[in-house]
């Protein structure tokens, strides 16, 4: 009944990259993919920049997944060890052992209930921030304490939005002031907000 939990502080998500090809860097590459900002101006997202953003997030998710896998293996080894220990016990020892295990299971159920409640709250906070609230992300930010979970949600939301903002700034600097295909003014009546731009680029999702 043990459940994998990823316990970590997402403050490192806020670190700004020095890679010139990542959002916030100084890379200047072409082949743009255009989107609009909230002023109705088309924003250029180069494939290289989008690839870098995706790689950063994927690496960090993979890192936490690896930790979760290692945690699961440790728990499996502990379970095998306990089974071998139980096989060597006499009746009284087994009764005492089983009683202790039952108490642990009850405590685990209480912890799981609390964890599920925190997952629901974390998903709500991510949705309100217009950030991806999938099970994978929720499992990354949720810990066994409400305070740390809230801190993780805020750090993750801010980091993703910062990456999008930096990409917008970089593309604005790279685009020519007049003419060209990479930076044009739009006259559409319905501007896209930050979340809509990011959602189309697979960074922020509903």
Curated annotation (Swiss-Prot):
Encoding gene (name): gp46
Protein name per Swiss-Prot or TrEMBL: Capsid assembly scaffolding protein
Region (Helix-and-hook motif): 186-206
Miscellaneous comment: When the gene is mutated the virus becomes resistant to the host CBASS CdnE-Cap15 system without altering the production of 3',2'-cGAMP or cabRNA by host CdnE; the host Cap15 effector protein seems to be activated but the virus still completes its replication cycle.
Sequence segments annotated as region (Disordered): 1-50, 83-134, 173-206
Bias kind Polar residues: ranges: 173-192
Stretches with biased composition (Basic and acidic residues): 25-38, 83-127
Post-translational modification remark: The N-terminus is cleaved by ribosomal processing protease Prp.
Keyword NAD part of the UniProt annotation: no
Chain positions listed as propeptide in the UniProt record: 1-13
GO annotations of cellular component type: viral scaffold
InterPro entries for the chain: Gp46
One Pfam family per UniProt: DUF4355
Swiss-Prot/TrEMBL keywords: Host-virus interaction, Inhibition of host innate immune response by virus, Late protein, Viral capsid assembly, Viral immunoevasion, Viral release from host cell
Assembly information from the UniProt record: Found in the procapsid with the major capsid protein in a 2:1 capsid protein:scaffold protein molecular ratio.
Impact upon substituting residue 198 to I: Defective in producing infectious virions
Its biological purpose: Scaffolding protein involved in icosahedric procapsid assembly. Coassembles with capsid protein(s) to form the procapsid. The scaffolding protein is found within the capsid as a series of concentric shells. During DNA packaging, the scaffolding protein molecules are released from the procapsid.
Domain notes: In the 80alpha procapsid the C-terminal 21 residues of SP form a helix-and-hook motif that interacts extensively with the major capsid protein, especially with the N-arm (approximately residues 26-70 in the capsid protein).
One biological process term in Gene Ontology: symbiont-mediated suppression of host innate immune response
């Amino acid at each position: 009944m043990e459940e994998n939990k990823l316990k970590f502080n997402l403050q490192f998500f806020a670190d700004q990259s020095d890679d010139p090809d990542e959002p916030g860097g100084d890379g200047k590459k072409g082949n743009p993919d255009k989107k609009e900002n909230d002023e109705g101006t088309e924003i250029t997202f180069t494939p290289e920049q989008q690839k870098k953003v995706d790689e950063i997030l994927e690496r960090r998710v993979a890192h936490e997944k690896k930790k979760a896998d290692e945690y699961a293996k440790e728990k499996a080894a502990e379970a095998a060890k306990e089974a071998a220990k139980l096989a060597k016990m006499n009746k009284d020892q087994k009764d005492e052992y089983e009683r202790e295990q039952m108490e642990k299971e009850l405590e685990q159920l209480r912890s799981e209930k609390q964890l599920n409640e925190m997952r629901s709250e974390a998903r709500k906070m991510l949705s309100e921030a217009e950030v991806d609230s999938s099970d994978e992300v929720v499992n990354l930010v949720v810990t066994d304490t409400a305070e740390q979970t809230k801190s993780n949600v805020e750090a993750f939301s801010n980091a993703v939005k910062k990456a999008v903002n930096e990409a917008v700034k970089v593309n604005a600097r790279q685009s020519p002031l007049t003419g060209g295909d990479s930076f044009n003014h739009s006259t559409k009546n319905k501007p896209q907000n930050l979340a809509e731009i990011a959602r189309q680029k697979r960074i922020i999702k509903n």
